[in-house]
Amino acid sequence: MRNLKEEPIQTLFLGTDWESTQILNALYNDKRFKITGVITNEDKPVGRKQVLTPSKVKEFATENNIEVYHTNSDTEKYKEALKRFNPELIVCIAFGEILPDFFIEYPKYKSINIHFSILPKYRGAVPVQ
């Protein structure tokens, strides 16, 4: 366990939706953590006019000057993200990609995946519906 006088834990956050943004906000405002970057989905077309719209996590990160990165399930991009952010902790919530083992095992304090249902019984993108 870290002493409170130590530097904050360098944290990489992976997420997309509003719910994950709530946890990102809590971590961002907790002095024990420093969000070094976020990985989220690319902007997606939304609505009848198909307007490119950022994820809620990207919106939060942009508003708070946190670097945003996209991997698109590309193994090399996951390797680049580890070099770029050098996380001590990875927190993943509502992120629609299967993460490579090397990525999950990299951080000093490992990785945390929060899922809003019992796995594997209620797996998938909308497990609580």
Per-region residue spans from a language model:
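One-carbon transfer enzymes
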Residues: M1-Q129
